[in-house]
Amino acid sequence: MSEYSLFTSESVSEGHPDKIADQISDAVLDAIIVQDKHARVAVETLVKTGVAIVAGEVTTSAWVDLEQIVRDVICNIGYTSSDVGFDGNTCGIINIIGKQSPDINQGVDRAKPEDQGAGDQGLMFGYASNETDVLMPAPIVLSHRLVERQAEARKSGLLPWLRPDAKSQVTCRYENGKVVGIDAVVLSTQHNPEISQADLQEAVMELIVKHTLPAELLHKDTQYHINPTGKFVIGGPVGDCGLTGRKIIVDSYGGMARHGGGAFSGKDPSKVDRSAAYAGRYVAKNIVAAGLAERCEIQVSYAIGVAQPTSISVNTFGTNKVSEETIIKLVREVFDLRPYAITRMLDLLHPMYQDTAAYGHFGRTPQQKTVGEDSFTTFTWERTDKAADLRAAAGL
């Protein structure tokens, strides 16, 4: 007998207040890394009507023009006028960044780099499944693509009455673990006051929703909710206060996998909240790409100042082709999950982080990028270059 289930995930646009904050925090991190690859950075941002507050702890030899960085991020998103809800050219900027505690430094820094301890205790999860081409859950992938398309239509002038703030939500129907349809779509987008709701709903349906979602997953009973409350003129930081790290489920797997609770943005790779979560995705994706399982969730945990993980566990939800004990053994053989080794394995000491701060940290395509004289690959944790090694070691 067929087993049906529904699962829903949401995403938000780059103009959502929390995502503005994430992008500012990661832009500051990138600017510091350009000058000092080994800086210790933990930057938090708050945005609200007419002001951006940047706080945190930084240990670095670099000097960056924080005010200009903040203004550039806000303006590039599209907030360039108080009419839109925020103006990056004129907003107030408050800088309350201090130095990192020497007590933390002594727990992290080591004479031998490979012995570098974790920057904090914590648990992190990585996940992958074979239900999409990027080995991610379909609901979060489709939710991201909707708000990415909203930004594209806004910035290109295709739908010039769109404004930066938007949210999406997609409910997928599963049969025996496979996606067979989309039951509901929600898209709320900020807009200027001149556009009628009827015109907005028609344009969004044709040029965003139907343009983005696979036609074979849409059916006659699919529900569409486009700006279901009606008018959405006031948005961005005027509508809601934005904070770094408040969209951790949007950033990861849309709720399909568990989350350790640590946010990503504004943190340098010595913080395992970020680097070990990226490593977890890398491990899980390679396990699925190798055919060892159709779904895989990995948990790692750390103690502050200690290099080796305190635990590694795997859950394949009954889809494994070899035992989970064998998979854990292979993970320990193929992947070095000490913090310094993760940084080297994924080549994380580059200004790659602002690109991660909107539309999800996972399921993205690695790209070659050059910043100044530094050329590197983004989203390295999305590579599947360990799949062949895992498959061979498993005897498949």
From Swiss-Prot:
Lineage, highest ranks first: Bacteria, Pseudomonadati, Pseudomonadota, Gammaproteobacteria, Pseudomonadales
Top EC group: transferase
Quaternary state and interactors: Homotetramer; dimer of dimers.
Record organism: Ectopseudomonas mendocina (strain ymp) (Pseudomonas mendocina)
Database matches in SUPFAM superfamilies: S-adenosylmethionine synthetase (SSF55973)
Localization per Swiss-Prot or TrEMBL: Cytoplasm
Gene3D superfamilies named in the record: 3.30.300.10
Chain intervals for the UniProt region annotation (Flexible loop): 100-110
Its job: Catalyzes the formation of S-adenosylmethionine (AdoMet) from methionine and ATP. The overall synthetic reaction is composed of two sequential steps, AdoMet formation and the subsequent tripolyphosphate hydrolysis which occurs prior to release of AdoMet from the enzyme.
NCBIfam families: metK
GO molecular-function term, one example from the UniProt record: methionine adenosyltransferase activity
InterPro entries: ADOMET_SYNTHASE_CS (IPR022631), S-AdoMet_synt_C (IPR022630), S-AdoMet_synt_central (IPR022629), S-AdoMet_synt_N (IPR022628), S-AdoMet_synthetase (IPR002133), S-AdoMet_synthetase_sfam (IPR022636)
Cofactor: Mg(2+); K(+)
Protein name: S-adenosylmethionine synthase
Pathway where it operates: Amino-acid biosynthesis; S-adenosyl-L-methionine biosynthesis; S-adenosyl-L-methionine from L-methionine: step 1/1
UniProt catalytic activity: L-methionine + ATP + H2O = S-adenosyl-L-methionine + phosphate + diphosphate
Co-factor note (free text): Binds 2 divalent ions per subunit. Binds 1 potassium ion per subunit.
